């Protein structure tokens, strides 16, 4: 459920980030490509 070392975004991830999971089920967990 938690997004470790990433950021939570409503909807999709910004173009420069990679989706790696979800935050609390309804938000996207995004990380920088070099942090994935």
Curated annotation (Swiss-Prot):
GO terms for cellular component: extracellular region. Keywords: Antibiotic, Antimicrobial, Defensin, Disulfide bond, Secreted. Disulfide bonds join 3-29, 8-23, 13-30. It is found in: Secreted. It comes from the Eukaryota. InterPro entries: Defensin_beta-like. One of its GO terms (biological process) is defense response to bacterium. Belongs to the beta-defensin family. Has antibacterial activity against the Gram-positive bacteria S.aureus 1056 MRSA (MIC=1.25 ug/ml) and S.aureus NCTC 4163 (MIC=6.7 ug/ml), and the Gram-negative bacteria E.coli O157:H7 (MIC=0.96 ug/ml) and E.coli 0111 (MIC=6.7 ug/ml). Does not have antifungal activity against the yeast C.albicans 3153A. This is Ostricacin-1. It comes from Struthio camelus (Common ostrich).
């Amino acid at each position: 459920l938690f997004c470790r070392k990433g950021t939570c975004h409503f909807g999709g991830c910004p173009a420069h980030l990679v989706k790696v999971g979800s935050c609390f089920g309804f938000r996207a967990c995004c990380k920088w490509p070099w942090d994935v």
